[in-house]
Amino acid sequence: MDTIMPLPTHFYTTQQLKQGEQDAASERGLELFHLMERAGQAVFTIAFAQYPTSHHWLICCGGGNNGGDGYIVAVLARHMGIDVTVWQLGDPEKLPADAHRAYQQWKELGGAVYAPQSEVPESTDVIIDALFGIGLKEVLRPQVVPLVELLNQSGKPIVAVDVPSGLCADTGQVMGTCIKAQHTVSLIGLKQGLVTGQARCYVGTLHYAGLGVEEVFAQHNTPSLVSIDGKLRHSLLPPRQACTHKGQNGKALIVGGNEGMGGALILCASACARSGAGLSAAMTHPDNVTAMLTITPEVMSTSWNKQHLFEERIEWCDALALGPGLGRDAQAQQIMQRLSSLKVPKVWDADALYFLAHNPSYDAQRIITPHPVEAARLLGCEVEEVEQDRFAAIRQLQQRYGGVVVLKGAGTLVDDGKEIAVCLQGNPGMASGGMGDVLTGIIVALLAQKIPLADAAKLGVWLHSSAADLNTKSHGQRGLLASDLLPHLRELLN
């Protein structure tokens, strides 16, 4: 996700923000109007920094306190010599007290207020979206939709106040239609709905302004979401001892790659070997063994039809990855039955999740890594329901299946039953085949190195997304392959 300055690592719900804003202001001895002034100042400062040569701003104000923030921006922009046009949705005389006070300041400057027009003024350089704030829980009213569409189609850059209008700040769901902002300025506390799912298409570059009350707010509110910190790798992966040997660095077993699906296993095994496992082994369909030995000679690859070797590998491994290219035939089902109860840390993906959906089980030693379609199958619901509230979906998955859940997608989430974490790294180039197989390989390598389940899942997701970001910085997003991530893993791990 695009940011300019490092963001805080904690995110909150709208309920926390609504009450916490008042409490923090009170504890600081501030009127809520003074907090509104600070909000407007923050939005103006960030917008002007992004568009310093702009001359004409269109500020769109709604009927709540978000609109009041917009009027403060209008006053500040006018003082800077910027031409300002204000569009007000609804009657400004019915604004809440603090927002009405801001409106009066604008009027005292001689500022005009207009109802939304059918066209955006041609001279507009910047649009400020102060229509709807964090309180939006319902689909936008039909009479508002044309305005949102007009602003989106104008081709003008949009800076959203706190949250793009039309986006649910708790879930990231688009409530019918939504402002597509180039920049969003989140105030006091970052909202959890800004960083996952559909929100990633609408927020643009995310900025944060604490308004001088962030410390007080944080003292009284437990985050509903935390971001994954890449510094985690330094504590989890300390420098290796000079006398270490491969057996001490973890033994990972990967089972998958049915007939015609060997590529998934090759990607997974390659990622495992590149992620620091001391020894990596694979059990696969006999058709894939030669390719595995040729492409990844570091991985000990054997046919899963050799039953005695299969059993030896099961006893040998420190961690298991099950599912990449496994298939859904009778043999795959037998393998699932044999390995389901294995008492080692494990990560299940792809076809393993298909079998899990049809034969649910709870396992505290397992990581599952569904994408939204797989998550919907595991929950017995529609994909749209998963994407409408990814937080609710991942909580249900963790409660039903245990262990750690990684809900993949834009703004991947990780839930260990204690907290939910989000990955801010990653980019649209990752929407290509084989990416999930690489993630599974990374995670099983970390598990084999005795990293706890939750930490392995979080660090694995961060490494995976960060490797993709490193590659696309040099080569662009379109055409990114899962195998392109492999060289960067070693760099990030060290």
UniProtKB/Swiss-Prot annotation:
GO annotation, biological process: metabolite repair; nicotinamide nucleotide metabolic process
YjeF C-terminal domain segment(s): 229-494
Record-listed ADP binding positions: 408-412, 427-436
Co-factor binding details: Binds 1 potassium ion per subunit.
Cofactor annotation: K(+)
ADP-dependent (S)-NAD(P)H-hydrate dehydratase, as annotated region: 229-494
Keyword Signal annotated: no
Region (NAD(P)H-hydrate epimerase): 1-221
A Pfam short name: Carb_kinase
Boundaries of every YjeF N-terminal domain copy: 17-219
InterPro entries, per the entry: Carbohydrate_kinase_pred_CS, CARKD, Nnr, Ribokinase-like, YjeF_N_dom, YjeF_N_dom_sf
Binding of K(+), residues: N66, D129, S165
Keywords associated with the record: ATP-binding, Isomerase, Lyase, Metal-binding, Multifunctional enzyme, NAD, NADP, Nucleotide-binding, Potassium
Biological function: Bifunctional enzyme that catalyzes the epimerization of the S- and R-forms of NAD(P)HX and the dehydration of the S-form of NAD(P)HX at the expense of ADP, which is converted to AMP. This allows the repair of both epimers of NAD(P)HX, a damaged form of NAD(P)H that is a result of enzymatic or heat-dependent hydration.
Family designation: In the N-terminal section; belongs to the NnrE/AIBP family.
Protein name in UniProt: Bifunctional NAD(P)H-hydrate repair enzyme Nnr
Source organism: Vibrio cholerae serotype O1 (strain ATCC 39315 / El Tor Inaba N16961)
Gene expressing this chain: nnr
